Design a protein with these regions (language model features):
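Membrane-interfacial amphipathic/re-entrant helices at transmembrane-helix boundaries
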Residues: 2-71, 113, 118
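Membrane-interface starts of transmembrane alpha-helices
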Residues: 10-25, 92, 111-123, 144-148, ...
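Hydrophobic core segments of alpha-helical transmembrane domains in multi-pass membrane transport
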Residues: 19-35, 72-76, 97, 101-103, ...
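Single transmembrane alpha-helix segments in multi-pass membrane proteins
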Residues: 33-37, 53-107, 120, 124-132, ...
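A cytosolic-side transmembrane-helix exit/cap motif
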Residues: 63, 110-113, 138-143, 165-175
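Transmembrane helix-bundle core of multi-pass membrane transporters
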Residues: 149, 153-222
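Membrane-helix/interface signature in polytopic inner-membrane proteins
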Residues: 215-242
């Protein structure tokens, strides 16, 4: 039987060398695979690591794509602090966006931007309800949350694929799996820069992310609720009697 014994002291050198070595090996074997597939490894390296940062509009598009991922990461940070291994964030993100998007399609003529805040709340509710399934199975039946949350990702992917090809499909999509267009009030405006104009698709959502990061840090480290989450993860048995 294999047993794992934690070290008494963690090597300071390996805390630095470990991540660097992991990145190097990942890049090396990745380039090796691309080489076997017939691609130029140097061109592959450029396209993956340098090309996205070669133009300002490409950098802005990276920031746009990072916005929802950062929100998901903050949510997972709370889970991991509580020692809950939720790896179904992708499915929860899908169901949250599906619920928020479906709600927006119910009001095709709304123009006020306050509507976006309502969509955000509904999106959080949709993701939370999807996460509630592995949570209730874990707390009531002691079902492994890793397996359940992972399997629900594929359920969510298939479900949204069905929805955009069925109930939410735009009759004018010419057979493509596209939803009906959203109203002006359901779309986040792009940021205009003086003398430059718009930088790709960069929108005001990035400002929300900039505010959300320090707020999340303050919540986890400076509030009673954050302290409870930390205690739950560090000492779950003690947390039951708290």
């Amino acid at each position: 039987m294999i047993t794992f014994i934690p070290r008494d002291k963690v090597s300071k050198n390996w805390t630095i060398i470990g991540p660097i070595l992991s990145i190097f090996l990942t890049v090396f074997f990745g380039l090796l695979i691309f080489t076997f597939l017939g691609y130029n490894p140097l061109e592959t390296l450029y396209q993956i690591f340098l090309s996205p940062f070669s133009r300002i509009d490409r950098i802005s598009d990276i920031l746009v794509k990072a916005c929802p991922l950062i929100i998901v990461g903050i949510g997972l940070m709370l889970c991991f602090r509580a020692n809950v291994w939720n790896i179904g964030a992708e499915g929860q993100f899908i169901m949250g966006t599906l619920l928020a998007g479906s709600f927006a399609l119910l009001f095709p003529s709304v123009e006020t931007k306050f509507f976006i805040f309502i969509m955000i709340v509904i999106g959080f509710i949709g993701g939370a309800l999807w996460a509630f399934i592995p949570a209730i199975l874990k707390t009531k039946l002691n079902v492994n949350e890793i397996l359940v949350s992972l399997m629900l990702v594929y359920v969510a992917m298939l479900f949204i694929d069905f929805i955009v090809r069925g109930p939410l499909r735009d009759p004018m999509s010419f057979g493509f799996p596209l939803s009906k267009p959203y109203s002006e009030g359901a779309i986040i405006n792009k940021i205009p820069f003086p003398g430059i104009g718009y930088l790709g698709q960069l929108h005001y959502g990035i400002l929300f992310i900039i505010l959300l990061i320090p707020i999340s840090w303050l919540f986890v480290n400076k509030t009673l609720s954050g302290f409870k989450i930390n205690v739950l993860g560090a000492a779950p048995k003690a947390a039951k009697f708290a």
